C-alpha cells in the first residue's frame, strides 16, 4: 500500500473490499474463474479452453498496449459478452461464505477506527456479493 499524504484533519477511511480489506487467494481466483467457467458453459467449450482464450487475449492486449492490463469484463466483452452479463454472473455465482470466515481481528481493528473515523467500503463487484463478503467477514 502506498500512502501519499495523510491530511491532519482526517475524518474517514475508504477501503477497497476484495484483496485489500482481506486477502484470500482462493476466493480471488474464484471471482475470475466462475465467470470464465460460465462463459465456457454458454459457449459450449471446456473451462480450460475458456481460460486459455482469456489468457491469450490478455497477453495479446498487453503486447499491443505497452504492457497494460485489461479487465476480465473487457476481455469477455471482446468475446461478445456484454458487461451487464458479466456483472449478472458475479451476482449469481459469487458465494464469499464458501471461502471467507468471520475475522475477529479485523472486526476489532475496525471497531477501534470507527470510534474516530467514518469507514467506507468500495468495490468493483456488484452490491449483492459485496454485502455477502462483508457478512462473511462479520463486518456488515
Each language-model region and where it sits:
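Substrate-recognition/cap helix-loop segment adjacent to the acidic, metal-dependent catalytic center
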Residues: 107-120, 124-140
